[in-house]
UniProtKB/Swiss-Prot annotation:
Entry protein name: Putative methyltransferase YMR310C
InterPro entries on file: Alpha/beta_knot_MTases, Put_MeTrfase-C9orf114-like, tRNA_m1G_MTases_N
Record keyword Methyltransferase present: yes
Biological process terms in GO annotation: methylation
GO MF entries: methyltransferase activity
GO cellular component terms attached to this protein's record: nucleus
Lineage: Eukaryota, Fungi, Dikarya, Ascomycota, Saccharomycotina
Length: 317
């Protein structure tokens, strides 16, 4: 009898769903007094984003908060690093985050893992068939390639957090990419194949993150070529605007991607004013939103407004 264990793949059809992007301002942490408080506030955002299958988290930089002192790291970059840290497998963190960021991640390292992420199901990391990995440069490029001066942009080697890199069976992939690996077949697989039986799946690493340094960047530099299907403003304070209240969402069958912007009106107005020369015929930020969804509790904190809003969207619409 063979001692080789046979693994059976179980693939489930993906259900059609709505995809959400969250936009949070850097004022998220304006009331925090130290790194520990900032870390806990961002952890709440990461926890609810992963719980509700959020696809993207955008950090809107409030330029009015930038002070004259020279900081080693900006508030936006700190929030970004923390958000990425919470969705990075423990065995890859030393690779992903260089020494510049590690002093800012000490408090984050003491917090519990996000249990909704597929790759946290195995407490003993070596027991999982599927692992997250980072593609790294070929270790020994051929002399022929060196002579003709070609840049080595593809690789078969994957850093999966072990002492030795994994070599793919018959694939070449771009370097510096995040991938999901089947360690038995030594092939890159889709997140659906690896984690399709796990509640909370939306992408292989939880959510995509980016910084919007301006109002223009928020809408024009997203990951979707066709843009967002619908943009919804979630006011954090009571303020009359001409934006109509949300009455419906695109049907799930169309796989829509909805942008939810959590902010006070003053923050949005400041960001728009700084970019006003880009929108000559626009009267204000209200023209960029299809609807607004007031938070059940007025004057809410961003971290509190996120779960309330996502719960409303998942139950009412």
């Amino acid at each position: 009898m063979s001692s080789t264990r046979k693994f059976k793949k179980v693939e489930k059809p993906l259900s059609q769903t709505r995809h959400y992007s969250l936009c949070i301002p850097t004022t998220l942490v304006s009331d925090c007094r130290n790194l520990s408080q900032i870390t806990h506030k961002v952890y709440q955002v990461a926890k609810f984003a992963s719980l509700f299958n959020v696809s993207e988290v955008v950090i809107l930089e409030d330029n009015s908060q930038v002070d004259a002192t020279k900081k080693k790291i900006s508030t936006a970059k700190l929030i970004l690093a923390l958000l990425q840290y919470f969705v990075t497998p423990p065995y890859l963190r030393n690779t992903v985050f260089n020494e510049k960021f590690r002093p800012y991640l000490t408090a984050a390292s003491k917090l519990p893992r996000l249990s909704t992420l597929p790759f946290t199901r195995y407490q003993k990391q070596d027991h999982g068939r599927y692992r997250e990995g980072l593609t790294i440069k070929m270790q020994k490029p051929t002399l022929a390639r060196k002579k003709i001066g070609k840049v080595f942009k593809q690789t078969k080697y994957i850093n999966i957090g072990k002492s030795k890199a994994l070599a793919l069976q018959s694939q070449l992939v771009p370097i510096n990419a995040r991938v999901t690996i089947d360690t038995i077949t030594r092939k890159i697989v889709s997140p659906q194949e690896a984690y399709g039986d796990f509640t909370g799946l939306d992408s292989q690493y939880g959510y995509y993150t980016r910084i919007a340094s301006s109002f223009t960047d928020l809408f024009m530099k997203g990951p979707l070529k066709e843009g967002y299907t619908q943009s919804v403003y979630v006011p954090l304070t009571t303020r009359d605007t001409s934006i109509p209240e949300l009455s419906s969402l695109p049907t799930a069958e169309t796989n829509p991607h909805i942008l939810l912007v959590f902010s006070t009106w003053d923050t949005l107005a400041r960001a728009f004013k700084l970019d006003q020369d880009q929108f000559v015929d626009c009267q204000g930020p209200q023209e960029f939103f299809d609807a607004q969804l007031p938070c059940p509790v007025s004057n809410s904190d961003v971290a509190d407004a996120i779960p309330m809003t996502l719960t409303t969207l998942s139950t009412v619409f």
